[in-house]
Amino acid sequence: METAIEWITAHEILDSRGQPTLEALVGLANGATGLAQVPSGASTGTFEAHELRDGDPKRYGGKGVLRAVENILGPIQSELRGEDALNQARIDQLLIDLDGTPNKSQLGANAILAVSLATAKAAASAVGLPLYRYLGGPFANLLPAPLMNVLNGGAHADNNLDIQEFMIVPIGAPSFREALRYGAEVFAALKQVLRQRGLSTGVGDEGGFAPNLDSNAAALDLLMTAIEQAGYRPGEDIALALDVAANELLQDGQYHFEGKARSAEQMVNYYEQLLANYPILSLEDGLAEEDWAGWQAMTARLGSRVQLVGDDLFVTNPARLQKGIDSGAANAILIKLNQIGTLTETVSTIQLAVQAGFRTLISHRSGETEDTTIADLAVATRAGQIKTGSLCRSERIAKYNQLLRIEDELGEAAVYAGRVGLGPRGLPARSR
């Protein structure tokens, strides 16, 4: 069998934060290979699949991944040798069964995911297809709207902003290439505005600027100014999006935000004010991962006006997503491959979301590599949205460049999601 897995190798490498992660290389009988590298998050949900670390304080502060590498070279390779790489579902089920734990803690979700993705890449190579086409079939032609994280706060930066990500979304662009240009020009304008005001232009983990500001609203004002200075119309050409990462704010049942302890209802009141004043079309993790009652109330109040994205709430887990669907919590899900740990489970979660009318956003992690799989996955699944950081740092730009290549390859068949990818909304213009 030409597409049988013949060998698997793995290496400990570094991610964009200088922390260890791993890569796996899968080789098939016909000579095709697939290389995959896995990311790591900073603000992680409690219910994510387990990332296996060595725990040896003498190496990388205990964060080495040599045990995960050994699991790939040993039991995983033994289990998969001779299996057909074209049967992704079987490969992933074998990995899940071999691990035998609910959260992949025996072999490590990082080890399992690296092999799962590398297998898919090897299979795509074996049949002579680009990854997005191999995974998505003939109708994979939708380029996602990028949610570009240009101002960083929270766990992604050393500053005084509580909200973790302030994003721009080029909804009015006619193509992905133009969307990327819109974003790059706003990013350049934002840097100029920060310099003019004597503010820091140092960047956070995801490439966004990380200045100290008077308030979270001041960060939004900066974005509005930068959009206008770049020659674009807020709410028409470029909209805004936020990732609050509210788990990081929760202490003793209350949200500690801008120096005050707030209830879930008070947080929702705050978001409602922001929606009235700014063209915000997406709000991620506005409340904590176990605040189901708060999420239900927030969705009832705001869900018709804004995309409410569950990241820590759902952790790409179909069981948690089903709970959200059944209880009316959120209306969109962030998809992170390493939260669940295999390609098959990731795609199954996306399918469940789509069937329930939830929107899907394919996402990077704060600790990234040069791997571009999520760009192909976004096109393959017709997700319509992607989060892969700012307009600097090569591990972020790599994904954008891959999307440019895909769009060029698709030619006239390419469709840019734009505003439609985030749903038709009457976004308010600046009303302050």
UniProtKB/Swiss-Prot annotation:
Amino-acid positions noted as binding Mg(2+) in the UniProt annotation, renumbered to this chain: D243, E284, D311
Keywords: Cytoplasm, Glycolysis, Lyase, Magnesium, Metal-binding, Secreted
Chief place of localization: cytoplasm
Described function: Catalyzes the reversible conversion of 2-phosphoglycerate (2-PG) into phosphoenolpyruvate (PEP). It is essential for the degradation of carbohydrates via glycolysis.
Keyword Metal-binding: yes
Protein name as catalogued: Enolase
Cofactor requirements of the protein: Mg(2+)
Any GO BP: glycolytic process
Residues the entry annotates as binding (2R)-2-phosphoglycerate: Q164, K336, R365, S366, K387
Top-level class of the enzyme under EC nomenclature: lyase
GO molecular function: magnesium ion binding; phosphopyruvate hydratase activity
Subcellular location: Cytoplasm; Secreted; Cell surface
EC number: 4.2.1.11
